[in-house]
Amino acid sequence: MITVEADISDLWPEQSNWEALAQTACQQAVSVSASDFLLAKDYETEISVCFSDNDTVHALNKTWRDKDRPTNVLSFPMMEAEELAEIKNRVGSECLLGDIILAFDVAKKEALEKGISLENHVTHLITHGTLHLLGYDHILDNEAEIMEDLERKALAQLDIPDPYSDHETGKEGLDG
C-alpha cells in the first residue's frame, strides 16, 4: 500500500487536488515498475511529495547536484535499489521510499511551453520522480529508454499523452 504525504506551498493553485494527483501518480509509477509488490496491503510504503517553489528547489539542486539553477523535480531516495529488492522477501515491511520536490514556476513554465495542463505535466513529473525513488535512472541512453517507457506506460493508463513524443531519448532527462 502506498501512502503519499503531500506538503503544498501556497503558490500552487487551489482549484487542483494536488494531494490526490500525487497519490495517483505515485501509485501508477509503482504499478508499472519492478517494485509493484509495494502496492500489496502487506507493505506499508510512504512517499513524501513537496509542492514547492523555485528558490527551494534551486538551493537543493545546488547543494545536492552542484547545479546552480532550479529544476522541475528532484528526488531523494531513502534506500538503494538493492535494499528495495530485499524488502520483497519481508512481508509486512515498512518502507519510506523518499522525497519528491517540485518547483512551481519551472513546472508551470514547462507546461505552458508544451501546451499541456499543469496537472498533466505535474503528474508526469511525480511519475518520473517516483521511478527515481524506485532505483530507475536516465544517465545512460539504455537506462533513459527503460525509464521513459515506464513513464509512458504509467501515464497512458491515466489517459495522459506521451510526454516524449517530441524528442529523442536523452541522458539529461526531465530533471536536468
Swiss-Prot record:
**Organism taxonomic ancestry:** Bacteria, Pseudomonadati, Pseudomonadota, Alphaproteobacteria, Sphingomonadales
As for subcellular location, the record says: Cytoplasm
Q: Where does Zn(2+) bind?
A: 128, 132, 138
- Which enzyme class? hydrolase
| NCBIfam families assigned to the protein according to its UniProt record, in alphabetical order | rRNA maturation RNase YbeY
Q: Does the keyword Hydrolase apply?
A: yes
PANTHER family in UniProt: ENDORIBONUCLEASE YBEY, CHLOROPLASTIC
Family per similarity comment: Belongs to the endoribonuclease YbeY family.
The entry's function note states: Single strand-specific metallo-endoribonuclease involved in late-stage 70S ribosome quality control and in maturation of the 3' terminus of the 16S rRNA.
Tell me where the transmembrane regions lie. none
Give the gene that encodes this protein: ybeY
What molecular function terms (GO) are annotated for this protein? metalloendopeptidase activity; RNA endonuclease activity; zinc ion binding
What HAMAP family does the record tag this protein with?
A: Endoribonucl_YbeY (MF_00009)
Q: Which organism is it from?
A: Zymomonas mobilis subsp. mobilis (strain ATCC 31821 / ZM4 / CP4)
Protein name as it appears in the record = Endoribonuclease YbeY
